[in-house]
Amino acid sequence: MKVRVGINGFGRMGRLALRAAWDWPELEFVHINEIKGGAVAAAHLLKFDSVHGRWTPEVEAEGERVLIDGTPLSFSEYGKPDDVPWEDFGVDLVLECSGKFRTPATLDPYFKRGVQKVIVAAPVKEEALNIVMGVNDYLYEPEKHHLLTAASCTTNCLAPVVKVIHEGLGIKHGIITTIHDNTNTQTLVDAPHKDLRRARATSLSLIPTTTGSATAIALIYPELKGKLNGIAVRVPLLNASLTDCVFEVTRPTTVEEINALLKAASEQAPLQGILGYEERPLVSIDYKDDPRSSIIDALSTMVVDETQVKILAWYDNEWGYVNRMVELARKVALSLK
């Protein structure tokens, strides 16, 4: 029996998550809630994507429904999770992709509406199980965990690298810089924003801003709390980002050892298919539509004075992330059967 899935927020993450897992046997997508544009816009943007191209299935709107190859998904336009009659649609699992509801208090209404599990496509500010697939998904306990977060795209890129280096060499401390594409938290032209740098036109500048990806690693490796920090630089591109990791490790190492550790990890469980390893001189566009979370740029690995390590990791910050989120959804769905 398939687990019935609803999506709240049908923007970049919501639409791509549906694309990624539409034909998976464990999941049945039954409802979409999106406050902007109605079913017509939802269907159109699901079919036609400026970054990821046309989706193969036929997609159309019919009244308050979206049809995918003739299969209907009901559609609503409510502003809050507790306004959506999830129980009427038989939804077991919600993918919360709006980016607006990120605390247990604002997410609790789902459970009052009969939803069994909620996976948030963003870090949750208070207690929730923070899962990075391939790194700590073994922590999921079906009877205990009902609210989960798939962390952030950059945390999903960084965590596999930290796992390999920390478990193989030991990390004393480190700083990361994510060179990250534009997102819809920015503005096309100058406009008011609480982050004055994000208030500036996205297409004209490199924009330093914050990222919580490095500090979030402490949720997975508590011994690294206060030992990692980072910054983001938003760049005028639409897809494929790069994480620049600098670590001080606990023992002497070499470029060859670092790359060997990362390559070996990419070829076996639990990181196979999640961590990649690349020796060709590729650039960001080559990683568009790559489903992996983190791809090592082996040509760029550096070691200085035996213990300072620099690693570059590419990632499709949209497609790679949603693939991990729906893999988490599948893991959760299997626990409900």
Swiss-Prot record:
SMART domains: Gp_dh_N
Official protein name in the record: Glyceraldehyde-3-phosphate dehydrogenase 3
Location within or outside the cell: Cytoplasm
Organism: Nostoc sp. (strain PCC 7120 / SAG 25.82 / UTEX 2576)
Residues reported in the UniProt entry to bind D-glyceraldehyde 3-phosphate: S152, C153, T154, T183, R198, T211, G212, R234
GO biological processes: gluconeogenesis; glycolytic process
NCBIfam families linked: G3PDH_Arsen (NF033735), GAPDH-I (TIGR01534)
Catalysed transformations (reactions): D-glyceraldehyde 3-phosphate + phosphate + NAD(+) = (2R)-3-phospho-glyceroyl phosphate + NADH + H(+)
Function noted in UniProt: Catalyzes the oxidative phosphorylation of glyceraldehyde 3-phosphate (G3P) to 1,3-bisphosphoglycerate (BPG) using the cofactor NAD. The first reaction step involves the formation of a hemiacetal intermediate between G3P and a cysteine residue, and this hemiacetal intermediate is then oxidized to a thioester, with concomitant reduction of NAD to NADH. The reduced NADH is then exchanged with the second NAD, and the thioester is attacked by a nucleophilic inorganic phosphate to produce BPG.
UniProt subunit comment: Homotetramer.
The enzyme's E.C. designation: 1.2.1.12
Chain positions recorded as NAD(+) binding sites: R12, M13, K80, N184, N317
Keyword line: Cytoplasm, Gluconeogenesis, Glycolysis, NAD, Nucleotide-binding, Oxidoreductase
Active site positions, chain numbering: C153 (nucleophile)
Record's miscellaneous remark: Gap3 is certainly the main GAPDH present in cells, since no significant Gap1 is detected in cells under different growth conditions.
GO molecular function, one term: glyceraldehyde-3-phosphate dehydrogenase (NAD+) (phosphorylating) activity
Annotated pathway: Carbohydrate degradation; glycolysis; pyruvate from D-glyceraldehyde 3-phosphate: step 1/5; Carbohydrate biosynthesis; gluconeogenesis
